[in-house]
Curated annotation (Swiss-Prot):
Is the main repressor of the genes involved in the de novo synthesis of purine nucleotides, regulating purB, purC, purEK, purF, purHD, purL, purMN and guaBA expression. PurR is allosterically activated to bind its cognate DNA by binding the purine corepressors, hypoxanthine or guanine, thereby effecting transcription repression. Keywords: DNA-binding, Purine biosynthesis, Repressor, Transcription, Transcription regulation. SMART domains: HTH_LACI. This is HTH-type transcriptional repressor PurR. The gene is purR. GO terms for biological process: negative regulation of DNA-templated transcription; purine nucleotide biosynthetic process. Hypoxanthine binds at Y73, K188, T190, F219, D273.
Length: 340
């Protein structure tokens, strides 16, 4: 196997010159640069990415810790992040926690050992041990709205409480008074914030929040399906159901139609996230829009800026940034107007 010394010997230059050509860390004459690359090709020399990263202090890689890349909302964000990383010349290490807090710590440990330049976090399964692990390193990090607040990382706030309020207010404005909610598990930051938005809107309108109409479940179609079936077994039914996410709404609609009822004629349904497939539901789903592409680009831009600052001034303390973007209502066909 060829080494950098073999390349230098063939060209008649020092190994330092070859290194500068490969890493583009110093100007090298055009003829010499061409000769180095020709020698690399002829010898089939493959520079060690690890060794190169030790010299230039970068691996051109980013780690992303996410609850699950299988869920449509997360999958769309991962796609946006990966595409934007690619355009910026970075590789992406994707780590799924699958709702396992222990995996967060293991993934953090692995990413740090791989010397990634920065880390994105999009999960709620975060322990004090995980925080201690990260705080013991200098790896730049950006945390999404539902992640931990360690006082050190940049954060992106998506104002999902406002989104939950917006969804509920839309139902109220359309004449609905008997409203149920099928939320994600409320120990998760994002599920709790969306639920709090529901409570705020119902309270402002002076409407009764029935405990028997509050459900918690997985952010999956199965979770929505199970909870909706439990709701349909009750004597009194709501005129509308708020879903913690669009994936849950798919299960909710399935449960309603299997009972011989219709959406929205019998029960209206509103989702959250505006995933790509929600427009193709039957009926097309009214939902709360969260721009996955914008979120992904904002996260990467923020992280790359922090990485650059870290490389240029590693000992300089930084003040964490808070970036914000807001949800929007997307009206389709799954909510009936009872005022008409």
């Amino acid at each position: 196997m060829a080494t950098i010394k073999d390349v230098a010997k063939l060209v008649g230059v020092s190994t330092t010159t070859v290194s500068h050509v490969i890493n583009k860390t110093r100007f090298v004459a055009e003829d010499t640069t061409k000769a180095v690359w020709e020698a690399i090709a002829s010898l089939n020399y493959s520079p060690s990415a690890v060794a190169r990263s030790l010299k230039v202090n970068t691996t051109k890689s980013i780690g992303m810790i996410i609850t699950t890349s299988e869920a449509p909302y997360f999958a769309e964000i991962v796609l946006a992040v990966e595409e934007y990383c690619y355009r910026q010349g970075y590789s992406l290490f994707l780590c799924n926690t699958q709702n396992d807090a222990e995996k967060v710590q293991n993934h953090l440990d692995m990413l740090i050992k791989k010397r990634v330049d920065g880390i994105l976090v999009m999960c709620s399964e975060y322990t004090e041990n995980s925080l201690a692990l990260f705080n013991g390193t200098n790896v730049p990090m950006v945390v999404m709205d539902w992640g931990p607040n360690d006082g050190k990382s940049d954060r992106i706030i998506d104002h999902c409480l406002d989104g939950g309020y917006m969804a509920t207010k839309h139902l109220i404005d359309n004449g609905h008074r008997d409203i149920a909610i099928i939320a994600g598990y409320l120990y998760k930051t994002t599920a709790k914030a969306r639920y709090d938005g529901f409570v705020k809107a119902m309270t402002e309108a002076g409407l009764l929040i029935r405990k028997e109409w509050i459900f918690e479940n997985d952010f999956q179609p199965e979770g929505g399906y199970e909870s909706m079936n439990n709701l349909l077994n009750q004597d009194k039914l709501p005129t509308a159901v708020i879903c913690g996410c669009d994936a849950m709404a798919l299960g909710v609609i399935s449960a309603i139609t299997e009972k011989g009822l219709s959406v929205p004629q019998d029960i209206s349904v509103i989702g959250y996230d505006n995933i790509h497939s929600s427009r193709f539901y039957a009926p097309p789903l009214t939902t709360i829009h969260q721009s996955k592409t914008r979120l992904g680009q904002m996260a990467i831009d923020t992280l790359l800026e922090r990485i650059q600052q870290h490389n240029e001034q590693p000992s300089e303390p930084v003040t964490p940034k808070v970036l914000e973007f807001y949800p929007e209502l997307v009206v389709r066909s799954s909510v009936r107007n009872l005022n008409q």
